[in-house]
C-alpha cells in the first residue's frame, strides 16, 4: 500500500471507528463501513487537512470508496 493509502486508511479508522482490516481500497464508505452523510463530510475535511488538498463538493460526491479517496488525493496533492 502507498503512503497515501496508509494515511487514508488511518483517517478512516479513526473517524469511523472501524477495524483497520475492513478498510481496503474497494470498501464503500456507506455500504461497507457504515458511514452516513455527516461522516463523509468529516472524512473529506480530514483528508483536506491531512494532505493539503481541496476537495470541491462535486468531487466529494464522486468519492464513494476508500480507493476513490486515495486516487483523488494522489492526483491532486502538491
From Swiss-Prot:
The keyword Lipid metabolism applies. GO terms for cellular component: cytosol; membrane. Keywords: Cytoplasm, Fatty acid biosynthesis, Fatty acid metabolism, Lipid biosynthesis, Lipid metabolism, Phosphopantetheine, Phosphoprotein. This is Acyl carrier protein. It comes from the Bacteria. Carrier of the growing fatty acid chain in fatty acid biosynthesis. The modification O-(pantetheine 4'-phosphoryl)serine is found at residue 37. The lineage of its organism: Bacteria, Pseudomonadati, Pseudomonadota, Alphaproteobacteria, Sphingomonadales. Belongs to the acyl carrier protein (ACP) family.
Amino acid at each position: 500500500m502507498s503512503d497515501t493509502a496508509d494515511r487514508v486508511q488511518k483517517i478512516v479508522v479513526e473517524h469511523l471507528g472501524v477495524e483497520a482490516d475492513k478498510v481496503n481500497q474497494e470498501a464503500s464508505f456507506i455500504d461497507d463501513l457504515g458511514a452516513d452523510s455527516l461522516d463523509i463530510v468529516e472524512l473529506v475535511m480530514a483528508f483536506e487537512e491531512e494532505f493539503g488538498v481541496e476537495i470541491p463538493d462535486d468531487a466529494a460526491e464522486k468519492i464513494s470508496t476508500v480507493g476513490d479517496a486515495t486516487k483523488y488525493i494522489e492526483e491532486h496533492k502538491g
